[in-house]
């Protein structure tokens, strides 16, 4: 590897939308995320249902199909 061409790797604070914060390594000092291991349904065991329907579901609702 060439010297002097790689970005500086430092401690970074990761901030989640749920309020959870933890430290990791990154080239940025602060990283913001929408979902972390504290609020993701896979890790919490709680299922969140998305309110946004897909295009097919909207079509079926609009025209009264299944």
From Swiss-Prot:
SUPFAM superfamilies: L28p-like (SSF143800). GO terms for biological process: translation. GO terms for molecular function: metal ion binding; rRNA binding; structural constituent of ribosome. Zn(2+) binds at residues 16, 18, 36, 39. One of its GO terms (cellular component) is ribosome. PROSITE patterns: RIBOSOMAL_L31. Keywords: Metal-binding, Ribonucleoprotein, Ribosomal protein, RNA-binding, rRNA-binding, Zinc. Binds 1 zinc ion per subunit. The keyword Ribosomal protein applies. It holds the Pfam family Ribosomal_L31. Disulfide bonds: none annotated. Its cofactor is Zn(2+). InterPro entries: Ribosomal_bL28/bL31-like_sf, Ribosomal_bL31, Ribosomal_bL31_A, Ribosomal_bL31_sf. NCBIfam families: L31, PRK00019.1, PRK00528.1. Belongs to the bacterial ribosomal protein bL31 family. Type A subfamily. Binds the 23S rRNA. Part of the 50S ribosomal subunit. This is Large ribosomal subunit protein bL31. It comes from Bacillus licheniformis (strain ATCC 14580 / DSM 13 / JCM 2505 / CCUG 7422 / NBRC 12200 / NCIMB 9375 / NCTC 10341 / NRRL NRS-1264 / Gibson 46). The lineage of its organism: Bacteria, Bacillati, Bacillota, Bacilli, Bacillales. The gene is rpmE.
């Amino acid at each position: 590897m060439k010297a002097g061409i790689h970005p500086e790797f430092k401690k970074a604070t990761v901030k989640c939308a749920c309020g959870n914060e933890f430290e990791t390594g990154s080239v940025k000092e602060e990283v913001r995320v929408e979902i972390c291991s504290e609020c993701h349904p896979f890790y919490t065991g709680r299922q969140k249902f998305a309110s946004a329907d897909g295009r097919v579901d909207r079509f079926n609702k609009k025209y009264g199909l299944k």
